[in-house]
């Protein structure tokens, strides 16, 4: 068991107000203790370590200078919020991070008044801060009051268009608000795009002219890790038109870059900004992800997301794998197909590792594109690749594909362009909770004309679906698969091209048919075994396709059974709704046929293990068994054999 760190000063700080009497020297000590406590807590729970370590000093400075919760600190994404939670009355629960009934791994309004705006997806903080600033000036009333609005946003999040939309609007409205650019040059993947080469221009404009003089020669005063970033200013100045930085052109007063780990810089700067700011301010702070904890600093992803680990060594404790992950199966299957077909290319939005496309990039760098946190652009870029004769695989998490939905409709579906959507993290994903659940993609894709929508029941099926997507050139096609390990099934050497819109019968039975879409098939089969012990043998089928439906198979199941139950890892309005529409159109319900659809409930399910989340959703084997007994009108074991 890891020893708890000694934190005598932090032990006295239960809320930000307790910091007001501390000297600047004591705040430095507080930051050191806060860093140790963050490392200790995440070693127990796992979670996003590196981001929080990179903003420890910034977190201390913000809470020491501003008056939270009246002043609103909005953490973009929220990965970096663990130190903030420790300082804001939640230290006693910090070792429940991301656990069932515990603290969220992100900011969450329902959890604390110190979390004024929830987050988990990126690039929303500036819009939210502007909204608070406008609400303040219009006389809005909230229990904690409305003071300053401060957005803390990383350089990775600055690759998303929404951040610039917000800055453009903020510059126009000229409201007093503060944006702190947390520039660590290391989001999850290396930062992408021209913006990453722009961020270090040493300049600051009105009303902070005194900072200009201090900025001269500041590069030489920065610690070595920060010098290189600051030197990028020289390259940018060569091609710049007269008129200040991009941020100033958008209407912000710009200060920076400063050392985001030096409280001797942060504290006086924030105090000056608080006292003198009149309009929107941009503070550019250079930080280091994983700062102060060597295993995180030296990790390739700077400790972005970790399992539980040993504090002394940084060694993570992960359970041994019994089967390859779905993500790895997808990536390897795509690599095999790309070896045979040079038209295959891959697109991801700042998630090369998470989607497995880092493997593709190593093998085929000229055919792999990380577009940054820019799902809208990524989808349209993929559409034009398809229009140009390529075979693009647009690999995104289900929850993030939502951000590019208009492009899916307007640029892909309406034009019937053969973009292949590889939808990872489908269904309930566990510790990241509701913000990362892949609950809605079946519904929002299967309602689009001409869209083919598949779901893999196991890892072998996923391999077949990759091959099917490669071969499909008649419009868009999507296949979804969950987070985590596969079922350990035998893997085919080569993926088989599936017939579009055709499912498969797994086991033949009588009375009731269970039609599964996706990886709940394993739970359906467990339910089938339990039902067999009761004398009930259901027919079990794997739909494979939510669109187009296998009309022939479904209507045959109806013709030969008393009841049909569909099961899917998606929200209301998805696969089951399409089956119900088919049955309605065919007049099946006119005969009194019994139909039930098992879907995710109409709630956002809080974090837990995926198994616990599916238990809450009523989607496990026992729930399926109960549904079968209910639809057949069987309440007791003895009735089943009657």
UniProtKB/Swiss-Prot annotation:
Cofactor note: Binds 1 Mg(2+) ion per subunit.
The organism's place on the tree of life at top rank: Bacteria
Root EC class: transferase
Keywords associated with the record: Isoprene biosynthesis, Magnesium, Metal-binding, Thiamine biosynthesis, Thiamine pyrophosphate, Transferase
Reaction(s) catalysed by this chain's protein: D-glyceraldehyde 3-phosphate + pyruvate + H(+) = 1-deoxy-D-xylulose 5-phosphate + CO2
UniProt keyword Transferase present: yes
Residues at which Mg(2+) binds: 155, 184
GO molecular function: 1-deoxy-D-xylulose-5-phosphate synthase activity; magnesium ion binding; thiamine pyrophosphate binding
Entry keyword Metal-binding: yes
The EC number(s) this enzyme carries: 2.2.1.7
Binding positions for thiamine diphosphate per the UniProt entry: 79, 120-122, 156-157, 184, 293, 375
An individual GO BP term: thiamine biosynthetic process
Cofactor: Mg(2+); thiamine diphosphate
PROSITE patterns attached to this UniProt entry: TRANSKETOLASE_1, TRANSKETOLASE_2
InterPro entries hit by this protein: Dxylulose-5-P_synthase (IPR005477), THDP-binding (IPR029061), Transketo_C/PFOR_II (IPR009014), Transketolase-like_Pyr-bd (IPR005475), Transketolase_BS (IPR020826), Transketolase_C (IPR033248), Transketolase_CS (IPR049557)
Membrane-spanning ranges: none
Pathway(s) per entry: Metabolic intermediate biosynthesis; 1-deoxy-D-xylulose 5-phosphate biosynthesis; 1-deoxy-D-xylulose 5-phosphate from D-glyceraldehyde 3-phosphate and pyruvate: step 1/1
Subunit structure: Homodimer.
Biological role: Catalyzes the acyloin condensation reaction between C atoms 2 and 3 of pyruvate and glyceraldehyde 3-phosphate to yield 1-deoxy-D-xylulose-5-phosphate (DXP).
Name of the protein: 1-deoxy-D-xylulose-5-phosphate synthase 2
């Amino acid at each position: 068991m890891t020893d708890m760190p000694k934190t005598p000063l932090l032990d006295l700080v239960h809320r930000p107000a307790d910091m007001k009497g501390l000297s600047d020297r004591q705040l430095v000590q507080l930051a050191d203790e806060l860093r140790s406590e963050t490392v200790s807590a995440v070693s127990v729970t796992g979670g996003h370590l590196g981001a929080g370590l990179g903003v420890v000093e910034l977190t201390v400075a913000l809470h020491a200078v501003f008056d939270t919760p009246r002043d609103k600190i909005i953490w973009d994404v929220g990965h970096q919020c663990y130190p903030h939670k420790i300082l804001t009355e939640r230290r006693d629960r910090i070792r429940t991070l991301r656990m069932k009934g515990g603290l969220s791994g992100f900011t969450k309004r329902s959890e604390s008044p110190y979390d004024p705006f929830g987050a988990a997806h990126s690039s929303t903080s500036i819009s939210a801060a502007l909204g608070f600033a406008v609400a303040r000036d219009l006389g809005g009333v909230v229990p904690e009051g409305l003071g300053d609005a401060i957005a803390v946003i990383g350089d990775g999040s600055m690759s998303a268009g929404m951040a610039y939309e917000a800055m453009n609007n903020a510059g126009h409205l000229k409201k007093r608000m503060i944006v702190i650019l947390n520039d660590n040059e290391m989001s999850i993947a290396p930062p992408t795009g021209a913006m990453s080469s722009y961020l270090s221009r040493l300049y600051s404009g009105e009303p902070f002219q005194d900072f200009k003089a201090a900025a001269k020669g500041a590069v030489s005063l920065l610690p070595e890790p920060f010098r290189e970033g600051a030197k990028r200013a020289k390259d940018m100045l060569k091609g710049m038109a007269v008129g200040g930085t991009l941020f100033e052109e958008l209407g912000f007063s710009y200060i920076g870059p400063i050392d985001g780990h030096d409280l001797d810089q942060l504290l006086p700067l924030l105090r000056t900004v608080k006292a003198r700011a009149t309009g929107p301010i941009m503070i550019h702070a250079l930080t280091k992800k994983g700062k102060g904890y060597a295993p995180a600093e030296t990790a390739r992803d700077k400790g972005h997301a970790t399992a539980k680990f040993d504090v002394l060594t940084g060694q993570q404790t992960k359970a041994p794998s019994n089967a390859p992950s779905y993500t790895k199966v997808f990536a390897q299957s795509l690599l095999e197909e790309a070896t045979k077909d040079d038209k295959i290319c891959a697109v991801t939005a700042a998630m090369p590792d998470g989607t497995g496309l880092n493997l593709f990039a190593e093998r085929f760098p000229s055919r792999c594109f990380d577009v940054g946190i820019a799902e809208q652009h990524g989808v349209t870029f993929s559409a034009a690749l398809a229009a140009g004769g390529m075979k693009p695989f647009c690999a995104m998490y289900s929850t993030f594909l939502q951000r590019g939905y208009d492009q899916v409709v307007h640029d892909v579906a309406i034009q019937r362009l053969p973009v292949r959507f590889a939808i990872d993290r489908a269904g309930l994903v566990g510790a990241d909770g509701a913000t990362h659940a892949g609950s809605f993609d079946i519904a929002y894709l299967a309602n689009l004309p001409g869209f083919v929508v598949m779901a893999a029941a196991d890892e072998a099926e996923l391999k077949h679906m990759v091959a099917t997507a490669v071969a499909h050139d008649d419009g868009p096609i999507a296949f979804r698969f969950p987070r985590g390990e596969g079922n350990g099934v035998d893997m085919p050497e080569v993926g088989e091209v599936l017939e579009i819109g055709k499912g498969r019968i797994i086991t033949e039975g009588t009375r009731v048919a269970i039609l599964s879409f996706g990886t709940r098939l394993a739970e359906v089969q467990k339910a089938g075994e339990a039902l067999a012990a009761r004398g009930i043998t259901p027919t079990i089928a794997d739909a494979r396709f939510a669109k187009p439906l296998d009309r022939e198979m479904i209507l045959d199941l109806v013709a030969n059974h008393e009841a049909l139950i569909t099961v899917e890892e998606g929200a209301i309005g998805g696969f089951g709704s399409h089956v119900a529409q088919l049955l309605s159109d065919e007049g099946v319900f006119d005969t009194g046929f019994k139909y039930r659809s098992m879907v995710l409930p109409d709630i956002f399910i809080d974090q837990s293990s995926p198994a616990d989340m599916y238990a809450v959703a009523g989607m496990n084997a026992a729930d399926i068994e109960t549904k079968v007994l209910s639809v057949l009108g069987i309440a007791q074991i003895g009735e089943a054999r009657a």
